[in-house]
């Protein structure tokens, strides 16, 4: 072997750009959440006020719209808006960051790749349930009947089950059924969160009824009758609410994330090719 011979240069690994990718995840999550939060807050308030008997759905929605138009600053800087915004930005960010960190750990060259499985489901469910229960506990006290009081543990359990179902049908089920639907993943993302409302809305109404009327003296049959009284219109309202939350909001979050991560990946590859030239 000649004295001046050197081993061939191996290609440099693609830079991970960890913080840039996390920044894109955060931007996509907060932008999607900011877009849908006003609508979500309006529907959530109307359901709580309607169930407690303080207002009808339409009257509550009308009052909220007038408030947004007349006092936008007070609306967007209010505690209820902050709770809704934190809930959805936190949920989207958890899903985004798990995908990104998993791709970095496995050195996946495709920046926008998404993961699935129990770890992501449990993590996103924990984030969503924790923030959602916090939001709903405040909303129930803000707009429920009587003076504010602690939320019973049974209400927390019902809210947690409701949120686990919502996450499963928003993040895990769509990729499974997408090949079976015209329009693929986007169609699945829009349909499945709405479909699960037939199961989750009764849980939501039962929790509100337990808080509003309380007491172990109320029979199960009476609870069921009260839930059935509000079920149809509340299910429709929650479908209308969930469509932007995990349908439109989910599509927007994914679109922003994939677009900017694709751009970052292309710039990174060009820099690497230039460095090797």
Swiss-Prot record:
The chain crosses the membrane at residues 22-42, 73-93. It is found in: Mitochondrion membrane. One of its GO terms (cellular component) is mitochondrion. It is a multi-pass membrane protein. It comes from the Eukaryota. The keyword Ribosomal protein does not apply. Keywords: Membrane, Mitochondrion, Transmembrane, Transmembrane helix. This is Uncharacterized membrane protein C365.16. It comes from Schizosaccharomyces pombe (strain 972 / ATCC 24843) (Fission yeast). The lineage of its organism: Eukaryota, Fungi, Dikarya, Ascomycota, Taphrinomycotina.
